[in-house]
């Protein structure tokens, strides 16, 4: 079973005519490491936002298709539920919603700190993700 499944995903930002995502179909298995690469404006950040519900939840553009995380449709669940399964580290740490952090480690640890995870466990979990 795929951990993340994308089915015919399309998205267009409000007040634009160009699709940011145009019919994407793929699966990511649990435990996989995946890099998303492409030119500026190719839809990399938009795709990541679709993984954790910012699209269509926060950005209200034209949305079609499905993103499923462990067979749960992202568009039909809450962002708080999705945050338990999917994290997002933005491209520029100084533009984070969480405030300016100095390192990638601090960015990854931010969510765990908010959940009250003990420091030793947090360090271990962040180290594991960074490997």
Per-region residue spans from a language model:
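Conserved ABC ATPase "signature" region
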Residues: 109, 113, 118-131
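Q-loop/switch helix immediately C-terminal to the Walker
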Residues: 88, 92-93, 100-114
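Helix-to-loop junction immediately C-terminal to a conserved catalytic motif
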Residues: 52
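Conserved beta-strand
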Residues: 6-9, 17-34, 65, 129
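Conserved ABC transporter NBD signature motif
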Residues: 60-73
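The feature captures the beta-strand-to-loop junction immediately N-terminal to the Walker
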Residues: 37-42
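A short, flexible loop at the N-terminus of ABC-type nucleotide-binding domains that lies
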Residues: 1-6, 10-23, 55-60, 76-78, ...
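Short hydrophobic beta-strand immediately N-terminal to the Walker A/P-loop
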Residues: 34-36, 48
């Amino acid at each position: 079973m795929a951990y993340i499944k994308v089915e015919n995903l399309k998205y267009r930002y409000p007040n634009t005519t160009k699709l940011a995502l145009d019919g994407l179909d793929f699966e990511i298995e649990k435990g996989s490491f995946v890099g998303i690469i492409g030119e500026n404006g190719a839809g990399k950040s938009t795709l990541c936002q679709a993984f954790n519900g910012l699209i269509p939840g926060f950005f209200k553009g034209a949305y079609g298709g499905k993103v499923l995380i462990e067979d749960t449709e992202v568009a039909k669940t809450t962002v708080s539920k999705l945050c338990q399964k999917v994290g997002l580290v933005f491209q520029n740490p100084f533009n984070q919603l969480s405030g300016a952090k100095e390192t990638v480690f601090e960015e990854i640890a931010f969510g765990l700190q908010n959940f009250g995870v003990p420091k030793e466990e947090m360090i271990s979990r962040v180290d594991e993700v960074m490997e």
